[in-house]
From Swiss-Prot:
Alphabetized GO MF terms: arginine-tRNA ligase activity; ATP binding
The keyword Hydrolase appears for this protein: no
Name of the molecule in the record: Arginine--tRNA ligase
GO biological process, one term: arginyl-tRNA aminoacylation
Coiled-coil intervals: none
Keyword annotations of the record: Aminoacyl-tRNA synthetase, ATP-binding, Cytoplasm, Ligase, Nucleotide-binding, Protein biosynthesis
Gene coding for it: argS
Highest taxon above the source species: Bacteria
Sequence similarity: Belongs to the class-I aminoacyl-tRNA synthetase family.
Quaternary structure and partners: Monomer.
Compartments where found: Cytoplasm
The reaction(s) this protein catalyses: tRNA(Arg) + L-arginine + ATP = L-arginyl-tRNA(Arg) + AMP + diphosphate
A Pfam family recorded for this sequence: DALR_1
Position of sequence motif 'HIGH' region: 117-127
Organism: Cutibacterium acnes (strain DSM 16379 / KPA171202)
Amino acid sequence: MSSLPSRLAARIESAIGVDPQLRPATKPQFGHFQSNVALRLAKEEKRPPRDVAADIVAKLDIEDLCETPEIAGPGFINLRLRADVLARVASDFVTDPNAGIAQAEKPERVVIDYSAPNVAKQMHVGHLRSTIIGDCFNRVLSAQGHTVIPQNHIGDWGTQFGMLIEYIVEKRMDVEDFDLSGVEQLYQDSKKTFDADPQFADRARRRVVKLQGGDAETLRIWRTLIDISLEGFNATYSRLSVLLTDEDVAGESSYNDDLPRVVDELVADGLAVEDNGALCVFVEGQDAPMIVRKRDGGFGYDATDLAAIRRRVGKLKADRIIYVTDVRQSHHFEVLFQVARMAGFLPDDVEAEHVGYGMVLGPDGRPFKTREGGTVSLSDLLDEAETHAAPNIALAAIKYADLSNGLQKDYVFDAERMVQTTGDTGPYLQYAHARVSQILRKAAAEANPNVDPEADLDAMDWGRISVLDEPAEQQLALLLSRFGEIVEVVATDLTPHKLCTYLYELAGAYSVFYEQCPVLRSTGEVRGSRLALCAATRRVLGRGLDLLGIDAPDRM
């Protein structure tokens, strides 16, 4: 759905052949938008700007959207949208469950690779960003009608499992007695033994061979470790209120059977060649080759990632693949996509994108660490935030802080600041939603004293917006009209901070409206119209928060 500003700009460009570059007016008396297109054209045409502006206005056919354009100053064109048009468009948001989000003309199958914790280790701060960002993409693209296929590429394979399983066997431990934190401690203990005892290290390597060969006892312990880990991961996903489930898990081990075929195809196509005993793919413009099979015959992460692309295109029928990982992996994905296209695993009509994110920093501006210098577990991070606010508010603070800046930027985790209900924070948006809800609930109780105080506000009949005489009303309605277009931009560019900025502006516009335009104290048609405007605002705020994965409370 094109917003009113976009429709207006398109109509003007169609009339004059130039993008008018509409900008929000600096003051209400100048209308809603200004354009300096006449000043730009005047330089080219060597004519007075006001004369050029007059010619432009004469060509415009926008009476169905705007009041008569005005020429101001040296040649600015001021435009004011018609109040009845604003009212009609904003009224649609009162009852539309999707709040104006248009369904994609050509729905796609979109694979999103995110979260990806490692088995036998607790999720840490780095997984926070991948999980929250990927979940936001999942919600936004699903809202547009795309089929989203989450892929949780957990680290469930590798030589480290030989070390851990051998330690468990030799210590005669019953691994079922441990939770994820206990298993992580076992991993750390096994690593110390591996580093200190060469004989244990040899036995651990032989255990890897047993794992790869399908030894029953080794596989039983390995599968138990995965089950314990998934239980821990799911507990964290539940705390984070994200959409990932066990059905989305596609661990490294799931590609094991595909790896020989992938390498054979690369060799057959002349892409993989032997170099110092390893099989490598040399890519033009890259300093180092991609190693798809190591000297010892083992397959590395690159081969697994190629197999994943091959399956996601071939079996999952992906039209678009999105990877959400640390920005420091950008080069890896650049090479991966190049090789996948060279091999034909990634056709030209399938889009592949890596969305990199920055680090989480402590209040001191340094990478977030424990006092001992270790990695902070995600559960400890959530516990820290919940010492400052209730769980749903703390989570809103964390998610909004994560999503509201450009993703590649590092951000400072300052729980005390993030949970504030003032300023550019998640709790501020929650408070705005609760405040709108409170007004509507009071209005419903005044109309019917017997109304259920817990009744669904969205299910009530709030009528339509019919009166927009005040600038604050018009500005709020204008912002509402942009919501669908903002979501479209976020879905295309994968820029959730733009949705955060929009929602913050919307909450601010509602605050101005609340101060300048009494709702419950107004009467007649004005009161009904303002209540409908409140209902539309509540719906858009709630839908927008949901796309960010943030709870929209009716009370705070």
